[in-house]
Every structure is written in structure tokens, then in C-alpha cells.
Amino acid sequence: MSSIANIRFGAPTRRNILKAAGAGAALGVLGGFAGRAFAQEKLKVAAIYTVPFEQQWVSRLHKAANTAKDRGDIDYVATENVSNTDYERVMREYAEAGNKLILGEVFGVEDAARTVAKDYPDVAFLMGSSFKPDAALPNFSTFDNYIQDASYLTGIIAGAMTRSKNIGMVGGYPIPEVNRLMNAFMAGVKEVAPDTKFQVSFIGSWFDPPKAKETAFAQIDGGADLLYAERFGVSDAAKEKSVLAIGNVIDTQADYPDTVVASALWHFEPTLDHAIAQVKAGTFKAEDYGVYSFMKEGGCSIAPLGTFEGKVPDDVKAKVAEKEKAIKDGSFTVEINDAEPKSS
């Protein structure tokens, strides 16, 4: 894994791959899905993850799938820690095994994943991706964690809680799905503390808690008294140095009751439930599922303040509630900014 291109983005031949899928694949999928409803039977769903189940991002997919399984809607199997070089093989094995919906994240194998989808037109694929779906491959839909709404609101809280007006931010890679959350958080901070300084770092990994922790230590040494924990390991550093942290995707306050002030939560259930319904109805098609992560769709929220309920100023909580209401009713829209955030 020597570069971001090899890890999160496919090779720059995506257009050629999708063009190769062509109209023939489109007809095959229409023939496979049209009129083939699965409403009266459990849907066979498989998932392929490149990281452990407990990793923040993937844990939300795994949780949503298990919730659907517990409801009796699906049969669910999953494989974790699949390398990019093995990903295509595992996709094919799950398709051959009769699974009708395959879930995963293909940021490092964009082209290969689409090739597999082309070869299995009767199988629906719902994949985390940096790219948009293409009508030439109608059985391949994409999603991402568009939780900028919740990230913005946690930024408002962070801006009120930092005393030094110096915030450290540790991310995995400077790519859209990370950048948009960081930028939304920074915008929220500036809403209440416009002069705040930001230290922004990326560790070049999706799961390296020791490296994230060391990076966070350096930011604390640089004056940060609050950390944006986009990666595991950051809150450990905050706890050891007695500074505050803002969580991302999952709520870890139970593990860090004196450290994690607030967290932006991702709820994957609306995304997955829509896909399940579409496959069962025989109407699955190429679609951008990103919108189902928006707050107004129930795709994200702020975790309860819990141990910090009495520590966050009342006027700040009121401001957050006001903005949350505006986001949900559509009168306020958080900007989606995928540009790489910079230190200030």
C-alpha cells in the first residue's frame, strides 16, 4: 500500500471499465431483477470488509446488517480483513454462493469490483466508493458516509469547549469521505470560535491506533486542548494527556467518560434497508445511496452528551438544537466540501 491511489481510489481506467460493461450488462441486469421479487423469503446478503469488524466505519455496516438479520429480513454472512488483492476473489465466491446482495467497500479495488458486478448481473452490489454509480452497470450502487450534518454540529460544541482555541485533527487519508467530515467540523467550530487554529494530520492508514495516538500527542504538544478523533487511537492520547476529544462515526464516550465530549454518529440502517427493499421488490438499480446518510433521512445524529451534559454551556446546546432542527426541515444545509483540509 504505497499510495492513496492504490488504497482508496481505483486505477484511472474507471471510465473504460464502466464503458466495457456496456448495454449488454444493463440488459442482463434488467432481465435478472425485473419481476424477480424476493419479498416472501429471506434475502441472502454477504459483506466483504478490508478491516476488522470493530473498525469505526465498517462497524456501522456490520451493525445494520445484523439488525436486519435479527429482524428476520435477511441471512447474513461477512468476511473481515480481506486484502485488496483478495477482494475480487471473495466477491466472486459470495456471488457464486447464491447471495443476492453483496455489501462492502471497494475504495481500493474500484475497477475490479465493477468487473465482478458485470459478470454477475443477477446479483445486486452495494459498495462504499469514492465514485458515483453508472447507468451502464445497473446492478452496482454506491454509498459513502455523508454525515457532514452531525460533524458540523459537533464542531459547534468543540468551538465552545476549547480553551486554547487550538484543535488537533487526525484523519486516515485526505480523500473525500474524510475531508468532508473534517471540513464540516471546522465550519461548525468557526461558527462559535472563528479564530481557532487547526492542526490537521493524516496517518496514511485506516486502522493504525498507535500511529494515530502518536500523531495526536504531537498535536497536543503543539498546543491543542481538543482533538477531532477521526481515527482510533486519538481518544487514547486525549485521555492520557487530559484533553478533550470529539468522536466520529461511533460513540465511544462509555470508554472515555471524561474525554469524549460529543460524537457524530453514522446510522447505516436507512442505506441498507433501502437496498434490501429494492432487491426484494426486484427494482434494484444503479443509485447513489449517499443521501441516506443525511440527518433528515435518519442517517446520522449526535450522540447524547452524557457525562458532558452539564459541562457544555446551555446557549451552545440551544444553538445546536436550533441548527439541527433547521437541517432536518431543510432551511439550513451544511456544505459538502471534499477539498483536503489544511492546518491554519
Regions of interest found by a model, annotated:
Residues M1-G32, R36-F38:
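N-terminal secretory signal peptides
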